Every structure is written in C-alpha cells, then in structure tokens.
Amino acid sequence: MGLSFSGARPCCCRNNVLITDDGEVVSLTAHDFDVVDIESEEEGNFYVPPDMRGVTRAPGRQRLRSSDPPSRHTHRRTPGGACPATQFPPPMSDSE
C-alpha cells in the first residue's frame, strides 16, 4: 500500500506543503491522501473507492525546534557532560 494525493495538482512541494496552480498554499496531513496499491501504478489505476480509503498509520511525534522552550522535565547537560558540582557553604562548627 502507498499514499496518493487526492487534492489539487501540486506545482511545488516542500516540508509537507504544496502550492496549487492558483497559488494557494496547502499544508498536507495524512487525511489529504488516499490509500492505493503501489502495484496499480503500472496499470495506471489510482482510483480507490471511498470505503477503502483510510489512514494506514498515525503521524509520528513532532520534533522540537531549537527555538521551542525546554520542558520542565528536560534535563540539559553541561558542555563537559557532567552535572556541575553544587557549591555548599562549609559546615558550621560548634565554636561559631
């Protein structure tokens, strides 16, 4: 099985976005595609009845951009690879 675009004819495709012949920018999602049998490409038959259409797999996790703020649970390492030593004041003696 493969995916075939079922919408407007693309003239440019980059990063899951296409520009239609009318200049409209369209963001692509898995729902914009029809499931097709790749072997049917040789026969030239790309039509898939609506009852056979479906998403074959869920979209993957999106990667974080470097401009995104870090999560509260994200642990960042120092350039040396180790956690920095915590600086505690010296213990107080009985004479103080």
Curated annotation (Swiss-Prot):
A lipid is attached at residue 2 (N-myristoyl glycine). Keywords: Host cell membrane, Host Golgi apparatus, Host membrane, Lipoprotein, Membrane, Myristate, Palmitate, Phosphoprotein, Virion, Virion tegument. A motif (Di-leucine-like internalization motif) lies at residues 18-19. It holds the Pfam family UL11. Residues 37-43 are annotated as: Asp/Glu-rich (acidic). It is a lipid-anchor. GO terms for cellular component: host cell Golgi membrane; host cell plasma membrane; membrane; viral tegument; virion membrane. Myristoylation and palmitoylation (probably on one or more of the nearby cysteines at the N-terminus) enable membrane-binding and Golgi apparatus-specific targeting and are essential for efficient packaging. Phosphorylated. Phosphorylation does not seem to be required for recycling to the host Golgi apparatus. Packaging is selective for underphosphorylated forms. Changing residue 65 to C: In strain: Nonneuroinvasive mutant HF10. Residues 87-96 have a biased composition (Pro residues). It is found in: Virion tegument; Virion membrane; Host cell membrane; Host Golgi apparatus membrane. Its main location: virion. Plays an important role in the cytoplasmic envelopment of tegument proteins and capsids during the assembly and egress processes. Also participates in viral entry at the fusion step probably by regulating the core fusion machinery. This is Cytoplasmic envelopment protein 3. It comes from Human herpesvirus 1 (strain 17) (HHV-1). The lineage of its organism: Viruses, Duplodnaviria, Heunggongvirae, Peploviricota, Herviviricetes.
